[in-house]
Amino acid sequence: MKQALLIMAAMTTLAAPAMADEALAKAKNCMACHAVDKKLVGPAYQDVAKKYAGKSADELAKSIKAGGSGKWGPVPMPAQTALSDADAKTLATWILGGAK
């Protein structure tokens, strides 16, 4: 029983950061246009992770904050000027990790 509790505690600790980053994406309304595994208005986070594979979280964070058009189709992503640099990097790190 004690071993099972330790395993569950370890799993909860490991899962918490991903949950927090998904919660941040929801709180900042990113999930209104993006989903983890399917295209909505914008690309799926898993597709973004593939496209940005090998690039830094800072580079993706900069792209998130700046917005842009033509990268993923005809619908532009608006600049996320209200998003802090720290939150942009947190989201970028989560996305590059496969949004898990």
Whereabouts are the PLM-identified features?
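Classic N-terminal secretory signal peptides
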Residues: M1-M19
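Hydrophobic alpha-helical segments typical of transmembrane helices
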Residues: A20, N29, A44, E59-L60
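Short amphipathic alpha-helix in the helical subdomain of ABC transporter nucleotide-binding domains
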Residues: S56-L60, A88
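Axial heme c-ligation environment in periplasmic c-type cytochrome domains
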Residues: A32, L40-K50, K65-T93, G98
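Sequence/structural segment immediately N-terminal to covalent heme-attachment motifs in c-type
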Residues: M19-A35
